[in-house]
């Protein structure tokens, strides 16, 4: 089999320059023209739904078709349709009060936006990023993850059907292609991925003073209050953790449980997994770990915890032998692992859930605040005073109360991190503004 040929840095730069020249040669796209380009993306997702689900499944080895349809087809479709419906309103100049004359803000396209996406929900990130960038009137260059080769190749073919290269272009290839991509003088760069890579992206962008939005993830804590309905809370936490086998940047990473409720948490969790996944070994709805590297990483966490004497509790059908070749890992609870273990240092990104027993809320808040600021934080309870303590005394990219991850799915809320979990935000009007220049205009009276 011949080795694929990838674009070198000069070829990537040439695409950018063609896109920039096309943007400068004409007036910015009108609301109607932007809407028509968004309609093309909608049409692509509708026509290629089955192919996308199959390609993503092939890249994972095994991936829940139900989850793929919701996360990588229906969710970006909803984003595109909502963007299409609202973009004309977003584009309107905003009057600002002045003592005399007139003042307003106009939202102007930046020019060429670069988007680098991760592997865990590949089509979701491509089309959601595309929605905001096109709504703002930009040309777009995309670098999908090299860890989804079949999906990335399909997305490149799909977008080439619908867009001229000077409108939307896809650059595929291994890590060195991604590095060359991030060195380009974009007008804005959106990167989704690991914090370790995000640091390199930020350095590369700084050479050209490219503004960057980073969505990096982190260890998103979950807190169950003594005021919570425990059965409801555990059901929602476990259901969220099972999505994509925990391979989501906003997945609940570890959970604080009142110390007297830990045993009850474990028993409820067992029942929830048995109900949602009666079997694991032969269940196409249970997602595999993407590749061997991540599988070994997660097994390493378990081996280290086991060696440290941590109680590990596998959830699922008893005696369900999982073939390592399929890269399936049973949902596993870890009872109070020491903070020195890697499972409590790294973003888990898998179906492992450490349980942290606690006595008082202050110790929970202190623990969270002593660590890098997470992308998400989840609190379950009915005590308004405690809810306010969580909201006021912790800092995270977003918060979902009495559920997990929902803040990240809503187009009406900005999605992004803070501190170690990222910078900037997109989705909905916030994405439109991220990918626009807010130009101040004053007319003398």
Predicted segments with their positions:
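Rossmann-like NAD(P) dinucleotide-binding subdomain of oxidoreductase/dehydrogenase enzymes
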Residues: 96-232, 358
């Amino acid at each position: 089999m011949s080795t694929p040929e990838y674009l070198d840095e000069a070829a990537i730069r040439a695409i950018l320059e063609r896109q920039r020249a096309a943007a400068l040669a004409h007036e910015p796209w009108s609301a109607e023209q932007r809407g028509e380009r968004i309609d093309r993306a909608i049409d692509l997702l509708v026509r290629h739904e089955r192919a996308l689900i199959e390609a993503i499944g092939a890249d994972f080895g095994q991936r829940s078709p139900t989850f793929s349809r919701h996360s990588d087809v229906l969710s970006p479709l909803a984003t595109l349709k909502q963007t299409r419906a609202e973009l004309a309103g977003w584009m309107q100049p905003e009057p600002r009060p002045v003592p005399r004359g007139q003042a307003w803000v106009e939202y102007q396209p930046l020019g060429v936006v670069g988007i680098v996406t991760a592997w865990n929900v590949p089509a979701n990130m491509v089309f959601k990023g595309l929605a905001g960038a096109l709504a703002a009137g930009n040309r777009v260059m995309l670098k999908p993850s090299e860890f989804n080769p079949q999906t990335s190749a399909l997305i490149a073919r799909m977008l080439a059907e619908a867009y001229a290269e000077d409108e939307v272009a896809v650059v595929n290839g291994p890590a060195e292609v991604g590095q060359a991509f991030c060195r380009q003088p974009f007008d804005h760069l959106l990167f989704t991925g690991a914090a370790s890579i995000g640091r390199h992206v930020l350095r590369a962008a700084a050479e050209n003073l490219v503004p960057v939005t980073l969505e990096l993830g982190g260890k998103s804590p979950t807190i169950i209050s003594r005021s919570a309905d425990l059965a409801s809370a555990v059901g929602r936490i476990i259901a969220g953790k099972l999505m994509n086998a925990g391979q989501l940047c906003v997945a609940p990473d570890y959970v604080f449980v009142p110390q007297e409720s830990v045993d009850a948490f474990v028993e409820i969790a067992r029942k929830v997994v048995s109900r949602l996944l009666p079997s694991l070994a032969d269940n196409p709805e249970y997602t595999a770990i993407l590749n061997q590297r991540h599988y070994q990483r997660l097994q390493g966490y378990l081996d280290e915890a086991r060696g440290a004497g941590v109680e590990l509790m596998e959830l699922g059908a008893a005696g369900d032998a999982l073939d390592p070749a399929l890269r399936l890992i049973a949902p596993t609870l870890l009872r109070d692992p020491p903070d020195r273990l890697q499972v409590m240092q790294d973003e888990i990104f898998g179906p492992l859930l450490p349980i942290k027993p606690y006595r008082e809320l202050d110790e929970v808040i202190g623990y969270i605040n002593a660590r890098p600021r997470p992308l998400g934080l989840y609190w379950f309870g009915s005590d308004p005073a405690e809810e306010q303590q969580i909201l006021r005394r912790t800092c995270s990219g977003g918060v979902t109360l009495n559920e997990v991850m929902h803040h990240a799915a809503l187009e009406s809320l900005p999605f992004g991190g803070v501190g170690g979990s990222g910078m900037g935000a997109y989705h909905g009007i916030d994405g439109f503004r991220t990918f626009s220049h807010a130009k101040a205009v004053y007319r003398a009276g």
